[in-house]
Design a protein with these regions (language model features):
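Short coil turns and loop connectors of transmembrane beta-barrels in diderm outer membranes
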Residues: 29-31, 94-95, 146-147, 193-196, ...
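Conserved C-terminal beta-signal and adjacent last beta-strands/turns
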Residues: 12, 26, 140, 201, ...
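Gram-negative outer-membrane beta-barrel transporters
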Residues: 142-150, 158-159, 258-262, 271, ...
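Surface-exposed extracellular loop regions of Gram-negative outer-membrane beta-barrel proteins
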Residues: 45, 110-115, 158-169, 176, ...
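Outer membrane beta-barrel strand-and-loop segments of large Gram-negative receptors
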Residues: 68-89, 129-137, 227-233, 239, ...
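Small/polar-residue-rich segments within soluble enzyme cores
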Residues: 243
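Extracellular loop and loop/strand-boundary signature of outer-membrane beta-barrel proteins
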Residues: 3-11, 22-24, 68-77, 84-88, ...
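Face-selective signature of the C-terminal outer-membrane beta-barrel domain
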Residues: 14-168, 173-204, 246-247, 251-258, ...
Length: 449
């Protein structure tokens, strides 16, 4: 069971199945160094409702000329069946290295809905989406000299998504999307042994197919589209990455940064969408999502410094920042994390270790109200906060470890800016941000077999 603070339903039942098979063969010839393959299968069955773990909301019902308040108890089932496969070969000769391969992914998604108080709302289980993707990829590396290496790669995906909802078929909408999605990158890696320094710079391009929730859950797509399934385009991102890492004695430093241009960024706008009942009245009372594509600019950076004070005491200090702009509407890109800093101090012994984590997060004033992504949206500017956590672990025996910890030691009340209050994935969204957990004690045991 799982209670969702910012959603209209809780997870009352979960069932998961997973199977995996992997093989690897090394040193086949002087050139072919490795052939590897894997197949993974998973099945997830998730039942949500608004009455098992909470009191359902009341709704007005008209019966025989009388208006009554009835509990609006609802339950939904969501299932996903996934089969993934991958086959790759690694070759090396002289200064060259090459990884080539193919992969595939198959998804089937379905669900149902039931209402004990309003049987007319019942929808029997049926499959609503079929997804399949075939991809081919290659990565070529060339060792220019002892200090420099050039790496480049590309992949091509053929994606097919089928809309199997009865409503889409009845209205004559196009129910099949077929897209060919290219991706490529080039990266220059550099080593400076005299300065204990490694650096890199790279440029990449990727096209991303909208996922299930982006295609199926919003109430509409781009202006002029018949429905969301046919009204949202794949995202296209061109991004520059660069960074370095230096280890010099007890001191280590690192930094990385990125800047990118996104065409057809999938933006969700959360507002009221009328939903008419059988009597012609508006039956919707919640904010739901609409999707559209916009162009965006993104950038960000992360940097840190660490120091080994003694053989057992070490500490590191890091900071990270992200920025985004919706250039189509000349607004901040929503759901961007604020500036954050972390101080991590550790004491490491042979059989145990102790840790302290101090996290400081700045306020976020760059917001776009009621806009976001499929997970959540910007409700308002957020305040800054800081938290302190303690943890430790002890090695009981060779393959058994016990860990304990206290999160939010000072029991502060705070709210993350990326507050997952939106529930577009299930057709609802909340206007309320909820606080993160207060002081929290936890224990975990891990075993290896």
């Amino acid at each position: 069971e799982s209670l969702y603070a910012g959603r209209s339903m809780d997870g009352s039942q979960f069932a998961r199945e997973s199977l995996g098979l992997r093989f690897e063969k090394k040193n086949i010839t002087d050139v072919i160094k490795k052939i590897e393959g894997q197949v993974n299968y998973s099945y997830n069955d998730h039942i949500m409702d608004n009455f098992s773990l909470r009191t359902p909301p009341l709704v007005e019902m008209n019966h025989g000329g009388m208006t009554m308040l009835m509990p609006n108890a609802m339950a939904m089932q969501v299932t996903r069946r996934t089969l993934n496969s991958r086959l790759a070969m690694t070759s090396e000769w002289n200064k060259w290295s090459l990884i080539t391969g193919v992969d595939s992914q198959f998804n089937k998604h379905g669900g149902s809905m039931s209402s004990p108080t309003m049987p007319s709302m019942n929808v029997p289980y049926r499959q609503d989406m079929r997804f399949q993707s075939y991809g081919a990829f290659g990565e070529l590396g060339y060792q220019w000299n002892d200090q420099n290496k050039l790496v480049t790669g590309a992949r091509l995906d053929r994606v097919t998504v089928e809309d199997e909802r009865a409503d889409s078929q009845a209205k004559g909408f196009n129910t099949k999307l077929e897209k060919t999605l290219p991706s490529a990158f080039v990266r220059w890696e550099n080593q400076h042994p005299e300065h204990d320094l490694k650096s890199y710079i790279g440029l990449g391009y990727v096209e991303r197919m909208p996922d299930y929730w982006e295609l199926f859950s919003p109430k509409h797509g781009n202006a002029g589209s018949t429905n969301t399934f046919n009204g949202v385009n794949p995202e296209k991102t061109l991004q520059l990455d660069l960074g370095f890492q230096q280890q010099h004695g007890a001191l280590n430093t690192w930094a990385s940064a990125y800047a990118g241009l996104v065409d057809d960024y999938i933006l969700m706008s959360y507002h009221h969408h009328p939903s008419m009942g059988m009597d012609g009245h508006d039956m919707s009372h919640d904010i739901t999502a609409g999707a559209k594509n916009v162009d965006a600019t993104i950038a960000g950076a992360e940097a840190g410094i660490g120091y080994q004070f003694t053989d057992r005491i070490q500490a590191d200090l890091s900071a990270m920042y992200a920025w985004g702009k919706n250039t189509t509407d000349d607004k901040p890109l929503p759901q961007i994390s604020p500036l954050e800093g972390r101080l991590n101090i550790r004491y490491v012994a042979d059989k145990y270790n102790l840790g302290l984590l101090w996290r400081a997060v700045a306020e976020q004033n760059r917001v776009s109200l009621h806009q976001g992504n499929i997970v959540g949206y910007d409700l308002k500017p957020s305040k800054g906060f800081s938290t302190l956590s303690l943890n430790g672990s002890y090695n009981l025996r060779k393959d058994i470890d016990v860990s304990v910890g206290i999160d939010n030691v000072l029991d502060k009340t705070y709210t993350e800016h990326l507050n997952k209050a939106g529930s577009a994935g299930f057709g609802f969204a909340s206007e309320e941000q909820f606080n993160n957990i207060g002081r929290n004690y936890w224990v975990r045991m891990s075993m290896k077999f």
